[in-house]
Structure formats: structure tokens, C-alpha cells
Amino acid sequence: MNTDTPTFEAQQVVRLRRGDLIRRLLQRDKTPLAILLTAAVVGTVTGLIGVAFEKAVTWVQNLRIGALVQTADYAILVWPLAFILSALLAMVGYFLVRKFAPEAGGSGIPEIEGALEELRPVRWWRVLPVKFVGGMGTLGAGMVLGREGPTVQIGGNIGRMVLDLFRMRSAEARHTLLATGAAAGLSAAFNAPLAGILFIIEEMRPQFRYNLISIKAVFTGVIMSSIVFRIFNGEAPIIEVGKLSNAPVNTLWLYLILGMIFGCVGPLFNHLVLRTQDMFQRFHGGEIKKWVLMGGAIGGLCGILGLIEPEAAGGGFNLIPIAAAGNYSVGLLLFIFIARVLTTLLCFSSGAPGGIFAPMLALGTLLGTAFGMAAAACFPQYHLEAGTFAIAGMGALLAASVRAPLTGIVLVLEMTDNYQLILPMIITCLGATLLAQFMGGKPLYSTILARTLAKQDAEQAAKSQRSVAGENT
């Protein structure tokens, strides 16, 4: 008798086990797989829209600058034209925001944080077109704003749009896809996938519900967004400052001093942003006409400023490599720094659709380079390179203002491809964050969200009082 031949009973047992395994697989909860697949869709769409937004803003800027170049020989025409073109473009952005989607004003990142806690609405059918077209207007006008805020808010709203289109009802999917879109948006803006992931984990840590599914979804969305960005824009770093030399160990104390300087500047900058917001609110009082005219005036002034001192206008990406290379004197760097602080306050605090990441990176570069050049003059024996302090300063102001040192470190290293500077970056950003916290500074985005929620509660209370008064009469 052949003992190797399986008996009929043994074959039956194998078939039953196989059928039971297949049945368990079919009955298994497919929610995690569905979330990961939709996260890939969110990341891909966010990457495509993010690239399209960048190209659209560049196209508008080129049209505006081209019109000015054609009239450059006629001073009587070029100055009024610079004001009018930028004013009209800015007014488009302000009008769309105020008329159709007030939550699309400003950076948009606090709105995503509020939505993650289900405290703010996500009206993607309004926010997506308003933020895209409005951002084209304000950024195309040459205002001192960045595109990362719009892409983060656009990404979060794409996450909610995909959720609605696929009719996914679970709270886990709603929260996860919103966070995935926001992370993919930051990655699409800066070609910085790891910074996009850290931004959600660190900056949105009070709101983000960390679990295996949510973090895998964020990873998936960021990967797809980064792939889309690199297909269209290549793999070069977004800011070309060249390969800088490493910082010698005996110079690291200088980076701690630089961090302490930014630890003082960060809370002061946040305070000025909030006070300027209050000033604008008192001026327009919520009236759309005043608000749009005010925005047009600010946009027009940025257009004029772009003719007088181009470095003081725009997001700042073109300024960063020039300043980091040491092409300006310390005095000129400080002058441009002060000018850009003022223009950043005017543009961002007025509620224009646009971010503040890029302007803060430029401000950090200016102050960091000025410090580096001064340190090189005071300590010639160290053979210091001002560019290394510029890189450290880029992340330090972001860390002190937003209170996200890890995001600031990784974002700058990914954007400049200077990973060898990670140690001075850590020292500078940690020093800036600790001193900012010691001085009582609050994270900028969290503070803006708290003010928005307080305003929302006040409006709801006033509405309730009016309805009660109407019933009594």
C-alpha cells in the first residue's frame, strides 16, 4: 500500500481549511485597504492640482511682468500700470474669498486644523475654485505670500471631496483623508515628502489621530504627491544654494546664539501678525467693498514695490539663493528684512488667500545671512560661510513662529539638499523653539484657529439672540 497517497479524509480537511481561509479573507474588514487606496487617489489629485497651481501662478506673474517690460521705457506708463495690474489681480482674490468662501482667506492651515477636530466646515465645492483662482490673483500680483498654505488647504479639501465622491461615511476615513490631503499639499508645494509627513504629526499633533491606518494613509498620499511633482518638475531641490561646507564643531555655539535671536524674533513676529489682523478688521468691519478696495491698495503697493526693490516683493524663493550667496551687505540684508516684515504683515494679515511659510523662510534667510556675515567678520579664524547660517535661519524662524522644529529642520534640508547641516540646524531650531516657549510665545496657526473659533462662537451667539428676539416680538 502506498502511504504517500493522501487519503480522502485528508483531502477533505485541506479543502475545508482552504475554504475557511478564503471565507475569512472575504469577510474581513476592508476599510483599511479602502482608506489606503483612496489616500493614493487623494495624493495623486493633490499633486496634480498643486503642480497646476504653481504653473498657473507663474503664468500670471509672467503676463504681468511681460506687460511691464513692454512699457519699461515710458516711466509715465510703467508706474501706474504696475499699480493697476497688481491691484486688479489682488482684488480678484479678495473678492472671491469674501463673497463665496471666507474660510479660504489667509493661509488655510488653521482651517484644516479646525476641520480635523470637526470644529470648522469643509465646503470643498467652494474652497477649491476660490483658493485656486484667488491664489492665482494674489500671488500673481506679486504680493508677499507663499503657495504652501493654498496647497495644504486645497489638499485637505481634495481629501474631503474624494471621501464624498466615494461615499465613505466612517469618521476614521473622514479624518484620515483630510490629513492625508494636507500632508500631500505641503509635499507638492515644496517637493519635501518627509516634511509633509512631519508637518501633520508635529504641527497638527493636537488634532491628528495617530494610528497605523492614518499614518500609512499619510505616507501613501505623500508618496503619490511627490511622484507627481517630480514627474512634472524633476528631482532638483526647489531652492538652489549649492553644496555648502559642514559647520566645524568649534563654531556650533554661534548657531545656538542665532537660535536665541530667532527665539526672540518669532514671538514678536506672531504678535505683529495678530495685531495687524485686528487693525485690518477694525478698518473694513466685514464690509466687502472696503475689504476688496483695501486688498487692491495693498496689491498695487506690492506691484510698485516690485519695481523699486524686487527683493522686497513676491514669495521670496528667488531672493533666498541670492541672499544666501552673500551678494548683499549686512546693512542691505537688514533693510530688506525690515521691508519684507512690513510687506508680509500687510499681505498675510489682511486675509489674502496665500501662505506665510515661504515669506518666513525668506525672512529667516535674510537675518541668518546677516548674522553669518557679521560673525565671519568678528571671528575670521573660523573661516565661516554665511550660507550655512542662512540655511539654519530659514528653519529657525519657522520653528519659533509655528512651534514645529522638526518640520522646519527637515523642510529646509529637503528644499536645499544640504543634509550635512543637520546638526547646526537642530541646534538653531531647538534654541529658537525653547526660547520662544520660555518667552510665552504661542504657535501662530493654533492662535489664529482659536481666534477664528471665538469669532464663530460670537457670530452664532448673536444669531441665536436675534432669532429669540424675533420670536418674542
Swiss-Prot record:
Chloride binds at S107, I356, F357, Y445. Pfam families: Voltage_CLC. Residues 109-116, 177-189, 193-201, 387-401, 402-404, 405-416, 417-421 dip into the membrane without crossing it. This is H(+)/Cl(-) exchange transporter ClcA. The chain crosses the membrane at residues 33-69, 77-100, 124-141, 148-166, 215-232, 253-281, 288-309, 330-349, 355-376, 422-438. Residues 70-76, 142-147, 233-252, 310-329, 377-386 are periplasmic. The gene is clcA. A motif (Selectivity filter part_3) lies at residues 355-359. Belongs to the chloride channel (TC 2.A.49) family. ClcA subfamily. The record marks E203 as: Mediates proton transfer from the protein to the inner aqueous phase. It comes from Citrobacter koseri (strain ATCC BAA-895 / CDC 4225-83 / SGSC4696). A motif (Selectivity filter part_2) lies at residues 146-150. One of its GO terms (cellular component) is plasma membrane. A motif (Selectivity filter part_1) lies at residues 106-110. It is found in: Cell inner membrane.
